[in-house]
Curated annotation (Swiss-Prot):
Its main location: membrane. It is a multi-pass membrane protein. Belongs to the wax synthase family. It comes from Arthrinium sp. Keywords: Glycoprotein, Membrane, Transferase, Transmembrane, Transmembrane helix. GO terms for biological process: terpenoid biosynthetic process. It is found in: Membrane. This is Acetyltransferase atnC. Acetyltransferase; part of the gene cluster that mediates the biosynthesis of the meroterpenoids arthripenoids. The pathway begins with the HR-PKS atnH that catalyzes two chain-extension steps to form a reduced triketide, which then primes the SAT domain in the NR-PKS atnG to initiate three more cycles of extension to give a linear hexaketide corresponding to the polyketide part of arthripenoids. The FAD-dependent monooxygenase atnJ then performs an oxidative decarboxylation at C11 of the atnH/atnG product, via an electrophilic aromatic hydroxylation with concomitant ipso-decarboxylation. The chain crosses the membrane at residues 10-30, 40-60, 68-88, 306-326, 333-353, 370-390, 407-427. InterPro entries: Wax_synthase (IPR044851), Wax_synthase_dom (IPR032805). It comes from the Eukaryota. The keyword Glycoprotein applies. The gene is atnC. GO terms for molecular function: O-acyltransferase activity.
Amino acid sequence: MALVNNPIQAFANVALLFAVQILIPAFLIITTPKYSWLRYFGIPCIAFPAYLIFQLAPTLSNSIFHNSFLACEGILVVAHCVNLLLILQDGGLTWSDLRRSGVAGEKSETPPDATFLRKLISAVRLVVSLRGVDTPWEAKNTPPHPSSLGPGGGSRASFLIRQGAILAWQYLFLDVLLEVTKQEPPENTDKFYRPGMEYEYLNLTAEERFIRAFMPFVSWFVVSRLLLDSTWRALSILFVASGLGSPQSWRPLFGSMWDAYTLRNFWGKFWHQILRWPFTSNVNFLTRRVVKLPVPSLLDRYTNNFLVFLLSGILHAVSANIMGLSAVESGSIPYFSSFALGMMLEDGVQAFYNRLHADKERKTGIWKKVVGFIWVVFWMSLTSPWYMFPSRRKVAGEAAWVLPFNLTEVIGMPMMWGLLGTFGMLVKWAFGTSL
């Protein structure tokens, strides 16, 4: 497939490649037995479209974030399909496994001789569900639907109205952030993010220390979360409105930020769990079935943690390549890998504290959460510059995303803040949203 500079044609090509990535594993799941040589042959057939998607990604738009997101999704699908075709249920999933697990619906509704199309649709839904929602393999801590929608996500209409209203508010917020980014003085890049600054710790001014503490909080809790969540909501609207998906299968992407008072909770409860099932399944296969580490053991636990974060770092290094940074320049591999060490430290402190207070109630008090949030921000202030400063220098004061229409430029920042606040309170009142 020839690479193109026309965004519309590039989008069409990427959509076709994603369709190939989804249909090949779905077809193999329902037609081949476990350990079939066709499954092994299918993996490179799924990986090649991922390579082409990566090549096409820079031509899709002027938004570095969304181009990188699509490039990484293609690669992530490969890891997901290795699990579905070769690892899960000892040799990969088959149609019989889908029926027994209830993924294909109730057994009475899905006889063994169900039509080929019905089987294919069931398999496709599993392939596109990177978190395994509503399956026996659902990623741990996948957030439930909000109480305002009910456990099943509510009716199609109520789901679409809620998602559309929240997405509109997120769009306004991203519009404001885009304008704020444009107004940042260009000299700040050299002042705060100059080369080598990410590894400087001792000779920092008070202003530089504040930037280090403030930037990770804004980047992870606000900007990155908004960009990912708005993209997820837009996709949910597209799939549910078209009938390709149901509200039940499009659960919230993020948990509550109030749970992020430990590093383990930040990544395991608050942050999205899209990488969790594809990566942990492959890592567990390596450590437990190939290397045969003792289970359960601290060696197994922390080796798995490290390897999962290492894979995440590699994936984000690939993402950084879209903006012209090499894997080494991006700093993503040491950054994400460092969280394995951070979790070891906090697990040790928590174990020591619990041993001293073994006779007391283990409920997490407010003061413990405050201390925990301070710890999370502290660790991120130490390590986030490794990953964020190189990309900040690369975009040089520009935003990593673009919007089709900038309302802030039309009505001005003061009125935009008022609109954002008013609409936000309306959305909060009408749909019971939370942080």
